[in-house]
Amino acid sequence: MSSNTVAEFATELKKSPATLLDQLKAAGVGKAALSDALTESDKQRLLAYLQASHGTTSVDRKKITLVKKSTSEIKQADATGKARTIQVEVRKKRTFVKRDDAQEGAADGAGSAAFAEPEHPAPAAQHDVPEAPAEQAQADAAPAADGAAPALSSEDQELARREEQARHQAELIRRQEAELAAKRAAREAREKREREAEERAAAYAAQEAEKKAAASAVKQVATREQAAEATARNAAQLQARAKAAAESKARSDEEAARAADLDARRRKAEAEAAAIRSMLATPKKAVMVAKKPEPPPKPVPKPAAAAGDAKKGTLHKPAVGATRTAAGAARAGAAAGAPGAGKEVKSAKLSSSWAGDPAKKKEIKTRGDSSGGVGRNNWRGGPRGRRGDSRDQRDEHLQAAPAETRIIEVHVPETITVAEVAHKMSIKASEVIKALMKMGQMVTINQPLDQDTAMIVVEELGHKAVVAALDDPEAFADDDVAQQSIEVLPRAPVVTVMGHVDHGKTSLLDYIRRAKVAASEAGGITQHIGAYHVQTPRGMVSFLDTPGHEAFTAMRARGAQATDIVILVVAADDGVMPQTREAIKHAKAAGVPIVVAITKADKPDANLDRVKQELIGEQVVPEDYGGDSPFVAVSSKTGQGIDALLEHVLLQADVMELKAPVDALAKGLVIEAQLDKGRGPVATVLVQSGTLKVGDVVLAGQTFGRVRAMLDENGRPAKTAGPSIPVEIQGLTEVPQAGDEFMVLTDERRAREIATYRAGRFRNTKLAKQQAAKLEHVFADMTAGEVKMLPIIVKADVQGSQEALAQSLLKLSTDEVKVQLVYAAVGAISESDINLAIASKAVVIGFNVRADAGARKLAEGNGVALHYYSIIYDAVDELRVAMSGMLAPEQREEIIGTAEIRTVFTASKIGTVAGSYITSGMVHRNARFRLLRANVVVHTGEVDSIKRLKDDVREVKEGFECGIKLKNYSDILEGDQLEFFDIKQIARTL
């Protein structure tokens, strides 16, 4: 087949068309495109060019070699039975030889050309030398030119390919058999080695048994010798331990002596430094002398110089006589030409930090001094011929040894003033200010510095800065309270009244105090912790009245922690209730004794035995039954059993022997806290030890302050408060947390540092918890459905009520509606609270507080809802109703009727219509339906329209026939049943 175009010729030659075009152009054949036609003459020119380029000019070729390559795949299973795909590549090479004319004539019945035997095909792993492009072109062009070479038959190709595949398969099988044989031989060798190892182990075990049997006799003999050696060795060890203990004691004594020596040297150096500072602080007077001739100075005796060398390097204040002698020697050494030499010169042995700069500091001008006292030792310092004095003075300064630099380890707290930094380094405050000015900070001597800045300044001045760990406040209190002898005296018991709501706790205290507190409580329930102390014939008793409502769990827990005795109030007509059980748990957790007061004993339906049995079930056993809890039946109206109750309380206190120091710094507990508009932060505290006085520095949690005023429970001013006395204090910087411990410190700066540290630590902990919660719930929030949020802002009158209300509201959260507490604080509602509510779209709740005029106006202008409550029940109930309105309504089905399809007909403009008979109830337009076929629901949809006697109707009742058109559904049959229902939305509640 002759090639007519360049592309066909390139395909026939199995060459790149671009390469063929380049070769054609080089051969002088002008072909520019692949579609250009090629003639036989063009092919001859290309062949001649290629032969010439490869060094062959003979056109007469006697032999042509054809190379053909084919690729195939075979699948063969290996030894494991897994099928493997093998790539097989077959290469064939055939050579065609052109015979001479004589040979053609001699050939008998032979063809015009004969081909040699095909060479063995090379497998894919062998590499054949590729034919040159010119030879390929010649191989393709020669048959075209001569027309005598026969084409390679396809049958021969297939036969050769199959032979090659068979050969490869046979080789693969032989290789696999060899591998299997090698593995089998290796396994047999391994098994043989294992058997030999087992035999050797058995032989070794037998030998060992024989050796052990032989050695057992030897061991019996050696045991006695070993016992003797052990006894001697133990004695040697005891001697070595005694020697080591003696050496250790000697070393410890030596270290103690060294430490004492260092301490003595340090105290001596500090005393010398203090003496020098006092000397330098004393103003000096210039010595004015008349200029008169003096005899030349005499050389200083050697013993004096030796004495001076002995004191070199130490800070010694010169004696008065020595100072005068030195001054006289200076005056004697200065001649008439050295004016001003009579001035008292500062000692060169002082520290360099106290030495003035002679080039900048002006000296006092004396008689005959024309230099103005400046640079008396420079080139203008005196007349000619007197340079020896300056040289002598310069030599004296050079010979004086510099003061030894002492590196101080400075402990830097959280905040420290400039003066304190200088004091810790024993330098002037001006040096610290100068160093800070070099760092770009303008500070004053009393300005506080942060820890990082102070440490940098200390390092800049050549000392070592160490972060001072903030001491434990308890350690501070112990340091302040610890005295040589603190006398402990008996104190009054602190009694907490606990029990269920409406069981008569406050009424019982009212009768004891002869007051009427219960009548003034909102709703008749206690919502704050009340603290009182009462004088009885047998002594004083302090009472804590805790709320009984379930929301005030934290208040009851604080009351149990601060108390000595718990009075458990149980109503005789009500028995043990949930808050009664909770109070018992708090008392047992605090480890305080319980005195049971069964109130309302005068009521007709009182059942004391039932109350006792219920309390026994809560592990509170009365004394009558062999327990340790006295039971007293009381009545707050008639006073029945009140004296017996107090008698039991005081008897229990006597048994406990309650004592506390009186003449000491006060410690106690914050019972309640609030923010008063006129008085500021106010805290009700219970003094547990020591005496609290007006003017004391108080540290309570994260707040501190100086006590400005104290009031007792009746509102009267008080100057002091001893142990077990509750008082109300003013003067704190912020409202403390209820339940915090308070203590009195002697240093206000220390109290400020501790409060600041606690606030920062609390803030960091809170932020860390919030971040952890965000990271923990981020995926849950992404996967969960949309949850409705109800943001609220809570402002209350006291800390305990705010805490209780916030916790109660947060407990109302569900999976669908959550309460988001934006802000909760103590005090009146301010404009900042309203602005926060506007930004967060929150509801503002005021508990026993009101909004000021500016806040009310701002709330009305921006539509912020303000809700005021005085009873915690009302706040919780109203918020529960609001959250119920945010819940998605419940979808509920209500069946309204059924119908039977008796006929089915089709209208041209309407479609399929079900002729139905209403068997029960009724059906109306747009009602929902279920299609039942053989009592199986096959479709649920909506009624499109209803017709009766060709008229559209809204509804059809039981016993009537009608035509019903179903919306988007027409697969209905006679005998089907239709069940009609409506979906009603039912409001949900929490």
From Swiss-Prot:
Which parts of this chain are annotated as the region G3?
545-548
Q: Which residues bind GTP?
A: 499-506, 545-549, 599-602
Its domain of life? Bacteria
Which intervals of the chain are annotated as region Disordered?
92-402
Q: Where is the composition biased (Low complexity)?
A: 104-116, 131-151, 223-243, 281-290, 318-342
Which CDD domains does the UniProt entry name for this protein? IF2_eIF5B, IF2_mtIF2_II, mtIF2_IVc
Q: Which residues form the tr-type G domain?
A: 490-659
Q: Which family does it belong to?
A: Belongs to the TRAFAC class translation factor GTPase superfamily. Classic translation factor GTPase family. IF-2 subfamily.
Question: Cross-referenced PANTHER family, in alphabetical order?
Answer: TR-TYPE G DOMAIN-CONTAINING PROTEIN, TRANSLATION INITIATION FACTOR IF-2-RELATED
Q: What protein does this entry describe?
A: Translation initiation factor IF-2
Q: Which organism is it from?
A: Verminephrobacter eiseniae (strain EF01-2)
Q: Which gene encodes it?
A: infB
